[in-house]
Design a protein with these regions (language model features):
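Conserved AMP-binding/adenylation subdomain of ANL enzymes
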Residues: 106-126, 130-174
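Short loop/turn segments at beta->alpha junctions
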Residues: 5-8, 101, 159
Length: 177
């Protein structure tokens, strides 16, 4: 997320023993990451998905083009392995790391099917920055598992009138904000 500062990145990298950062290639993000690296010894690789690929970052798209064909590992992941980690908002101190296993997405079938009342014909929009857990549980797992279409609106600044215009123009049928 573009909201993390150098301090936030250092804390999270060290708390989670992060090995690689994959990020949008925008200076508001990459400058903070670059500044955090001297205090983030576990990080070995930086990858930018563009549009810019700063010095010290690998180009995600070139990496995909040069990648060898996928080979299934001898020992694939199990449902109990860590799939995803969130950090809490830190309202009562430093953010706390919360790990989820590979069964976590299944819990959000209920979110998409019953809370959002989604069908295969639904077009769903969740308003949340990808740095927040809501971005995952509110617009990916239960929604896609349930077969709904997910509307993505990448906006620089939250502007209610622009959101309402997108909802109207694209006939969004479900909203979570």
């Amino acid at each position: 997320t573009h909201l993390l500062t150098k301090k936030d990145i250092v804390y999270r990298c060290n708390a989670a023993d992060i090995k690689m950062i994959v990020c949008a290639g925008e200076s508001v993000i990459t400058d903070h990451i670059t500044a955090a690296m001297p205090e983030s010894p576990s990080v070995k690789r930086l990858v930018s998905v563009g549009p810019e690929v700063p010095e010290g970052f690998e180009d995600f798209h070139k990496g995909i083009e040069a990648a060898a064909p996928f080979v299934k590992p001898e020992h694939p992941n199990t449902n109990d392995d860590i799939s995803l980690m969130y950090f809490t908002s830190g309202t009562t101190g430093e953010p706390k790391m919360v790990a989820h296993d590979f069964t976590y997405p299944l819990g959000h079938i209920v979110t998409g099917s019953f809370w959002h009342n989604l069908k295969e014909s639904s077009l769903h929009l969740t308003i949340a920055d990808t740095g927040w857990g809501k971005a995952v549980w509110g617009k990916l797992y239960g929604q896609w598992i349930g077969g709904a279409n997910v509307f993505v609106y990448d906006h620089e600044k939250f502007t209610p009138a622009a959101i309402l215009e997108k909802i109207q123009d694209y006939h969004v049928t479900s909203l979570c904000a």
